[in-house]
A protein has these predicted regions:
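Core segments of cupin and vicinal oxygen chelate
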Residues: 1-51, 151-194
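A compositional/structural signature marking long, glycine- and acidic/polar-rich segments
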Residues: 177, 182-246
């Protein structure tokens, strides 16, 4: 599929009030206008798109959906044919649902693990409209997508890899330097970053491990790092640089229990002409000062929505 990357992500949270302050004041997100049909939810902006992250009221903190952006209508329709040929069931969003997401067209379907995917094109935007919630030089999104996400899967199966590689058309990036079974994947049209999504094997567990966001300046990483430390927010990894990409980053936990990785490019990503097998996760730093799996990672029964669980029981 001709996919740019992740266009948006949606979460359910029992901590909306915490996100109202945390999003703008810690991360520098702009606060978007909630649709009239979803006034209870919180919509965040990191660029001129109508929104990139949505937080909906929920009983537990969990990933609700990942919106994958097709480059345009022709690519979207080709993607639907790909889903049909693979026997993947999908549901088209009606006019009201498209307006809710702020897109021209959208379909919903599941990956083999049960995570909710959406494929869309034509997200609403307003030029030069992004205003950060605090002094911040801004985020890198646009042609690379909103960022990357690492999710946990209770079973890492060949079916999952076939779905990601053959149906979604993602590129295989590698297994990283972790100790467990992990796969990193990149959308077909993303040539700016190493991966858009990774699946890590955690027997009996599901949920978001972390979300990675690129900022425009090293200063944004440093200032966010200072804010996190001054507020004594829980951290996963200290400032450091991974072995496989020339980026500076650190990880800290959000009010929903998953981590944000705040990333600045030291130099452009070098591409992946061959698969690497790094000896260590990082060249320097990235000291593990918190759990690798936060409270956002739970049992599948806690993380999956009721509709999906009911369908599995039938």
């Amino acid at each position: 599929m001709d996919i740019i990357g992740i266009g948006y992500m949606g979460f359910e949270t029992a901590n909306l009030d915490a996100w109202r302050e945390y999003g703008p004041q810690v991360m520098g997100f702009g606060v978007g206008k909630s649709p009239d049909s979803d006034l209870e939810s919180l919509y965040f902006r990191i660029d001129d798109r109508r929104h990139r992250f949505a937080f909906h009221p929920g009983r537990v903190d969990r990933l609700a959906y990942i919106g994958w952006e097709a480059v345009g209508r022709m690519a979207f329709e080709a993607g639907l044919r790909k889903l049909e040929a693979a026997g993947v069931e999908f549901v088209r969003g009606d006019t009201a649902f498209c307006e809710l997401r702020g897109v021209r067209e959208v379909v919903r379907f599941r990956d083999p693990v049960g995570y909710q995917y959406e494929l869309f094109y034509g997200q609403k935007w307003t030029p030069r409209s992004f205003i950060p919630g605090r002094p911040h030089t801004g985020f890198l999104a646009d042609e690379r997508g909103a960022g990357h996400v690492v999710v946990i899967t209770p079973e890492y199966t060949p079916e999952l890899e076939r779905f990601l590689l053959d149906v979604m058309g993602f590129h295989w990036y590698g297994a990283g330097a972790g100790k467990g079974r992990t796969g990193f994947f990149r959308a077909k049209l993303n040539d700016k970053t190493s991966h858009d999504i990774a699946y890590g094997h955690g027997p009996g567990r599901m949920g978001v491990q972390h979300v990675g966001l690129f900022v425009r300046n090293v200063r944004d990483v440093g200032e966010t790092y200072d804010i996190v430390r001054k507020r004594e927010l829980p951290m996963m990894m200290t400032l450091g640089q991974h072995s496989q990409d020339p980026h500076l980053s650190f990880y800290h936990f959000t009010p929903s229990g998953f981590a944000f990785e705040t990333i600045a490019e030291i130099e452009p990503w070098q591409g992946d002409p061959y698969e690497l097998n790094p000896e260590t996760l990082s060249l320097w730093g990235h000291e593990m000062v918190g759990p690798i799996l936060g409270p956002s990672v739970r049992t599948p029964e806690e993380v999956l929505d009721a509709e999906y669980l009911a369908g599995k029981k039938r």
